[in-house]
Curated annotation (Swiss-Prot):
Keywords tagged on the record: Alkaloid metabolism, Glycoprotein, Hydrolase, Signal, Vacuole
Species annotation: Arabidopsis thaliana
GO molecular function, one term: hydrolase activity
Compartments, record wording: Vacuole
Glycosylation sites: N80
EC class (word): hydrolase
Protein name, per record: Protein STRICTOSIDINE SYNTHASE-LIKE 12
Protein's GO biological process: alkaloid metabolic process; cellular response to potassium ion starvation; response to jasmonic acid; response to wounding
Keyword Cytoplasm listed: no
InterPro entries assigned: 6-blade_b-propeller_TolB-like (IPR011042), Strictosidine_synth_cons-reg (IPR018119)
Induction trigger: Upon potassium (K) starvation.
Superkingdom of this protein's organism: Eukaryota
Length: 335
């Protein structure tokens, strides 16, 4: 059985191998502090300045163009300690924390976090130590949380578990066995109740609520499939296939009120991710645009592609930087 240290070494190798340095003027790298890595997901507050991202060792960083990265919050009291730095902090994710999915409640300013090993958390607008909401449902531990989004119409939080059988340190085992124990959950802040909405998902890595709150999309990384779960309307409470056209989808992010979504995608050959790309789909699951990103990230596992004010913010699981790609106005390359 793959040891945790071996898994970490492999993931670091995958993130750094085949690195290609792009001279594209529209692309910018923002290296995270050297003691941390893997800006996996992004969130943007109501000020519209900078962004927030979760990194290894259990920290949430805030980036402002004038100051760069600053500490905004931490998942545990240990997250600020030196032994949560570097590869040790990655190895001690069960103590330090590892934010995987983050999203703001746009009305309250609260930042919700799906921490991979430590459960669902919330952070006040002031930042600081996160408050744990829960690490289980119906008495069963989550094991491995991943994606998260907040319904912009109701404030209800939707989040996923990549697996209900394997923990983050066993991710390669889960992939090798094609584990299908992932779940989609709903957390209602008004009742403080967590509900299981979907089960039997294959590597449910990301989720995104539509701008009108009528449905939530759930990616199945292992199956190269995205499901749609209906929140409202005549199909409420049911699910269906949304698209099979995106290879190994990770996080999904809605694009404002356009009805479209960005999906982080790779081609997963055995355990080696290749050909990372950003894929835009519409509300019918049709692919509108594909942006190849191998020249900017090499063969690495993209975790998120998030559009904000004309830029794509691109994250990775273990990489040393956040990528920002300026979109060309009116461009929509055929794929």
């Amino acid at each position: 059985m793959t040891s945790f240290c071996s898994m970490i070494s492999l993931l670091l190798l995958l993130s750094l191998s085949s690195a290609v340095f792009s001279d594209d003027a529209s692309f910018q790298k923002l290296p995270v502090p050297e003691t941390r890595s893997g800006p996996e997901a992004f969130a943007f507050d109501s000020t519209g300045k900078g962004f927030y991202t979760g990194v290894s060792g259990g920290k949430i960083l805030k980036y402002l163009p004038e100051t760069g990265y600053v500490d905004f919050a931490q998942i545990t009291e240990s997250s600020n300690s030196s032994w949560c730095d570097g590869t040790i902090g990655t190895a001690l994710a069960g103590r330090c924390g590892r934010p995987a999915g983050i999203a703001f409640n746009e009305k309250t300013g609260d930042l919700y976090v799906a921490d991979a090993p430590l459960g669902l958390h919330v952070i006040s607008p002031a930042g600081g130590l996160a408050t744990k909401i829960t690490d289980s449902v119906d008495g069963k531990p989550f094991k491995f949380l991943d994606g998260l989004d907040v319904d912009p119409t109701t404030g209800v939080v939707y989040f996923t578990s990549f697996s209900s059988r394997f923990s983050p340190i066993q991710v390669l085992i889960a992939l090798g066995l094609k584990d299908a124990t992932g779940k989609l959950y709903k957390y209602d802040p008004s009742t403080k109740v967590v509900t299981v909405l979907m089960e039997g998902l294959s590597g449910s890595a990301g989720c995104a609520v539509s701008s009108d709150g009528s449905f939530v999309l759930v990616s199945q990384f292992t199956k190269s499939n995205i499901k749609r779960y209906w929140i409202k309307g005549p199909k409420a409470g049911s699910s269906e296939d949304f698209t099979n056209s995106v290879s190994n989808p990770d996080n999904i992010k809605r694009i404002g009120s356009t009805g479209n979504f960005w999906v982080a995608s790779v081609v997963n050959k055995i355990i080696v991710p290749t050909n990372p790309s950003a894929v835009k789909v519409n509300s019918n699951g049709e692919v509108l645009q594909t942006i190849p990103l191998k020249d900017k990230f090499g063969d690495t596992l993209l975790s998120e592609v998030n559009e904000f004010e004309g830029n794509l913010y691109i994250g990775t699981l273990t990489g040393p930087f956040a990528g920002i790609l300026k979109l060309e106005k009116g461009s929509c390359p055929a794929t």
